[in-house]
Amino acid sequence: MNTQPTRAIETSGLVKVYNGTRAVDGLDLDVPAGLVYGILGPNGAGKSTTIRMLATLLRPDGGTARVFGHDVTSEPDTVRRRISVTGQYASVDEGLTGTENLVMMGRLQGYSWARARERAAELIDGFGLGDARDRLLKTYSGGMRRRLDIAASIVVTPDLLFLDEPTTGLDPRSRNQVWDIVRALVDAGTTVLLTTQYLDEADQLADRIAVIDHGRVIAEGTTGELKSSLGSNVLRLRLHDAQSRAEAERLLSAELGVTIHRDSDPTALSARIDDPRQGMRALAELSRTQLEVRSFSLGQSSLDEVFLALTGHPADDRSTEEAAEEEKVA
């Protein structure tokens, strides 16, 4: 009979206070085992602080947190045997080769020399680093370093892997490689808790997502559930030229009776509408005024739009430097 807990993480009223401010303020999480669970939130929302508490790196000031049924405060050693942590900064040694780094990690985990070398070879090949196995880490690209860092965190395969913004600063090809690695880990039985500043990454990887702000969960569900939560369709259109946008915005506002949003593209407008027929009537009105529409679509809200509606911040309203500085502690 399988007695493996069905919940990888359970928190109730989790609190962490810094200098009188609640960085995490009564956080409740319920993370099923065997999937990718994403945590999204604006800068300073409490994401990294939450991970540090769950990984037993930081003691909570209130509430409870359990990992596979084990309390992070009273059973930290048991929790640590079940987890691994990796983030946007590599925890490997630049003065060693890729293979040497993984062998060292294996030895630190208690492997014999033979088993450590065997496991290092498995991971080097599995993560597509075979051609660089004997090169010093300082010669690796950012994407290669990130793959090696993740490999180092699973020398002993964890039941739960914390990935804290693992693809920040990577090019699209390297990000896709990391995504493939994450999917393979979950297929092999590892639960992944992912924080990311890229909403497309959460959309691609996460089976469920919690959006947190000011240290609390403000929404939770699958990406489909979150997108449906706005309860409306989104009309998006692009005009032939930017000079037409003000007039198109005026006409759409009068026809639809809703707020018209200006996108970053100077030719683009969008609006949330309840009835798709409203969108068709609005497009017909634009056509009658001879405003040329280059393209249009009518569909579900994007995760970016959900994030903006929930937090009041656009998803890209933060720099990489801000992400790196997030929730630093003294």
Curated annotation (Swiss-Prot):
Residues 9-239 form the ABC transporter domain. It catalyses: daunorubicin(in) + ATP + H2O = daunorubicin(out) + ADP + phosphate + H(+). It is an enzyme of class 7 (translocase). GO terms for cellular component: plasma membrane. It holds the Pfam family DrrA1-3_C. Keywords: Antibiotic resistance, ATP-binding, Cell membrane, Membrane, Nucleotide-binding, Translocase, Transport. InterPro entries: AAA+_ATPase (IPR003593), ABC_transporter-like_ATP-bd (IPR003439), ABC_transporter-like_CS (IPR017871), ABC_transporter_ATP-binding (IPR050763), DrrA (IPR005894), DrrA1-3-like_C (IPR025302), P-loop_NTPase (IPR027417). Its EC number is 7.6.2.2. It is found in: Cell membrane. The keyword Ion transport does not apply. The complex is probably composed of two ATP-binding proteins (DrrA1) and two transmembrane proteins (DrrB1). This is Daunorubicin resistance ATP-binding protein DrrA1. The lineage of its organism: Bacteria, Bacillati, Actinomycetota, Actinomycetes, Kitasatosporales.
